[in-house]
Amino acid sequence: GKDKALEYFDKLSENILSYTSSGSGPINALIMKEAAIGLGMTPQAVTKINEGQTELKIKYFEEGSPYCLYGQSIISGKENRAAVKEVFSFLSGKLTEENTEKFCPEKIYKTKTFDVPNYPAEIKYADMSGDTLQAKEAFLEKWKY
């Protein structure tokens, strides 16, 4: 259960260089040979591989890769302001398309397909159906790293 998982992390932490708050930290630690394993983000690893860091290898947990969902919203009552419309249009249009084209080529558009060299073609994603805000807050109350 959850307590056993936390006990596991207590033992594992003896061999952890650091728990980073940045997504690039684990990848940079690998490149600088400060770590043998880094839990990082796929697009950052792919970017470094494409820049010539060919010793990096992308592996996923047997249970699947964790994932994040992103979205944009506008505060109610602000949606008619010209500047808000302009920024929102950029975020949900051009920026999302450029990000998908350059870093995260997974299929999100019906009519567009992007290809990023060395980006894994088939990523198995983990079942994160119980990953709620309440579950995260409860976990963070016990997390000491």
Locations of the language-model features?
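Short beta-strand->loop
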Residues: 54-66, 75-78
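Periplasmic-binding protein-like
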Residues: 90-113
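A bilobed periplasmic-binding-protein/Venus flytrap-type ligand-binding module shared by bacterial periplasmic
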Residues: 68-80, 99-102
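Solvent-exposed, polar/charged alpha-helical surfaces in well-ordered, non-transmembrane soluble domains
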Residues: 7-10, 28, 32, 82-85, ...
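Short helix-loop capping/hinge motifs at secondary-structure junctions, enriched
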Residues: 1-4, 77-84
